[in-house]
Structure formats: C-alpha cells, structure tokens
Amino acid sequence: MALRESRIKTLLLSLVYPSRASYYNDWRDAFTSHPAFDCTELNILGLAPDVLARHLGAADAIITLHSCNADTLDYFATVAPVLGERRRGRLLSFVGNEYNSPYFSVPERTRLLGIARADVVATQLLQEAGAYLYGSIGARVVAVPHALNPNAFKPGPAAGARSIDIGVKGYRYPAFLGDDDRNRFLASLSATGPEHGLKVDISEDKRLGRAEWADFLGQCRGTVSTEAGSWFIAPNDEFIGRIAAYLRERHTGLVISNDSWLRRAARHLPSPVKSLLWAVTKHGPVKFEVTNDNAVPFDELYERFFRDTPRPSAYGKAISSRHFDAIGTKTCQIMLRGRFNDILVANEHYIAVDPDHGNVADALRRFNDVSQRRRITENAYELVLSGHTYAHRAAFVHRLLTE
C-alpha cells in the first residue's frame, strides 16, 4: 500500500529533558495530533540501540525533531548509526540552533545526518542557507520554518485591557554570533519607549515556559524582536574555532567546560533548579563555560574577529517560533527590518525599524496609533492562520515523505 493511501506509521524521535524551548512541544504536538500521522514516540535520551532498531522495523517514516541535535550531539551520535542501518522508512531530520557555536560542531552534526542517511533535512533557514550548511551529504534540503500553534497561543484580551505596552522575556544573544542587533534594539526600546508614554517590561534574564509565555504575551499590546540566527554561518568550524580558542584563553578561576559530565548532568535537572544553578554560577567563583564566555564584551569579539570578516552569501537569519507566538496572541510586533523567511512583510505584518534605528521614534508613533496597530496585528494573524500553522507544516512534511 502506498504511503499516501493511509496514515503513515511514523517513528517520532526527540530528546526530552527539562527545557523552556516551547517550540519543541509545538512540533511534537503537530505530528501526534495530525490525522495523517500514526506516531510512535521515543526519547533518544538513553535509548538502547536494539530498542530503536526494533521500532525502525515497523516504521514507514522516521522524523527526528529539532531537539535531537540542537543543544548537544551526545545522544544523536548514538542513534545515528542505528538509523543509518535501517532497511525501510524515509528519514526526515529537523535541525535545531542553526548557527556556529563554540560549544557545538556544525560539521559534526552534518556528518551525523549523513551517517543516519537522512533523506530530507528540514532547515529553519531559507533553503539556500540550509543547502550551504548541509548540502555535502546529498540529502534533499528543504526549508520548513516554524509556525503558529493556535491551541497554545490564542488571541489575548482586547488591546485596551492589556496592562503592558511593550514586553519581552528572554535571554541576551551571545557575542560569538557576531552581531549585537537584537541586544542593542531591546536596549534602545527600553530607553525610548517610556519617552513616548509607553509602559515597557523588557528583561533578558529569563525564558518562560509555553503557558507562561502565552499568558505574558496576552498582557502586552506589543513586543520587540529581530530575526533569529547569525550573519556568520559556515559549514565548517574554522572561524568559530578561533573564537572558541580565544574564549578559552580568557578563562580565569574554575570554569566547568560545556562538554564536561557536570554540564551534561545539569541538562537533566528541573528548569527551576537549572535557573538557580545558572544564577549562582554567573556570579560565583565557579562558572559554567557558557556563562563565563557570555560576560565577554561584544565589542571585544567584534573588533578581534568580525569587523573585517565578510559575511557569507547565504542568509543566516530566520523567522522564529516566538514571532508566530506573538502573532497568535494578537500582540503587535516592532522589529528590525528583515526577510523573516519571506513570510512577513515590513509594515504590513510588523512595524519595521531600520537597522540604524533612525526611525524608532516614527515606529513608536505608529505603534501608538490604535488603528495602525490593529491593522498590522490583524494582517499578521490572518496571514498565519491561512497557511502558517503547525498543522500546515505537518501536512507539508507528509507530502515530502510520500511524494
């Protein structure tokens, strides 16, 4: 029986440990709730090879979600050879955190995707950027960006009933990404928003869980953001390796490396405990490598590594799940002008600010115009409901696996 004639018996693999990345759950829910997929779920955390092999024998398709290769490759490295030895079933692998990092190897991830014999690599980036990163393994690279979960992110109260004008909860972007656009933009709006009579609640020391994040957005008339990702993506680790070596040279005191057993053990802790641990190591005598390196001033890395380094031709920025979350709660977005995977259009679906911030005052005036804010919010909501929910993405993946 052809796959398209019935529900696909799908093996859905993810790496599950306490995390506040709500989009992990959104993608999982997209497939488990979609009528075209008959899903069996497995957590690759400690998954025995023989157990995986047994399930592979019964699957028509295999999907590895972003979590399998986003923060660590420790567990994906164990399952990749077993996936590569399968005798049946097409494999579609999503890719998480598509930027070069001192703590994570992009070419090693690509190599493991090749070992797993991925038939389709689903990138969050534009297709040409994904091909630039993963094209060497011969798999089909397809752009499958994030989307809206309308069950989790529903329209909030009417704008007049919301208590915050502009709100953001998240983390500062690290200096090793090579641009400070988001951090500077949030700082700019934090300063100028009150000057325009706006109540601003912007913090960069905490990421909320899905329900808390949806509730917070529902309290905000607007939020501020930029595209996710980095201008300096590369299929190899040569450039980021030099940055990593420099950061290690700057270490002082007791620093727990990102690949130590202590760091790996911390991933298993409940989110509140992890948050407390991060706070303690950020200011105490013992530090995690990541928190230690995040204290390095952006200008220091920029002048040493990025100022004279040309950007690659591949566009390494992308729309993120948080953009769709805001659209779902009908929270107006003020954002630096960008492509957003060619989905969102400036001043039609978000209020656009120029890269030099020269029109911030004008953007805030437009935001304060109730009719303009409502128009942009409704335009974005209608666009996303018409073709950019996770149900739409799951249907697209179904076509990829059955064509």
Stretches with model-predicted labels:
Residues 186-202, 250:
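A conserved nucleotide-sugar
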Residues 22, 176-188:
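A conserved mid-protein helix/loop that constitutes part of the nucleotide-sugar donor-binding site
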Residues 148-162, 178, 211-212:
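Acidic anion/phosphate-binding donor-loop and adjacent secondary structure
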Residues 3-18, 22-44, 212-403:
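Catalytic binding pocket for nucleotide-activated donors in carbohydrate/polymer assembly enzymes
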Residues 55, 112-114, 209, 216, ...:
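Structural alpha-helical scaffold elements that stabilize or flank donor/cofactor-binding regions
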Residues 200-206, 292-294:
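Active-site donor-binding acidic/aromatic loop of nucleotide-activated sugar
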Residues 160-177, 219:
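Conserved donor-binding/catalytic core segment of Leloir-type glycosyltransferases
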Residues 2-138, 147-155, 361:
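Extended catalytic core of nucleotide-activated donor transferases of GT-like folds
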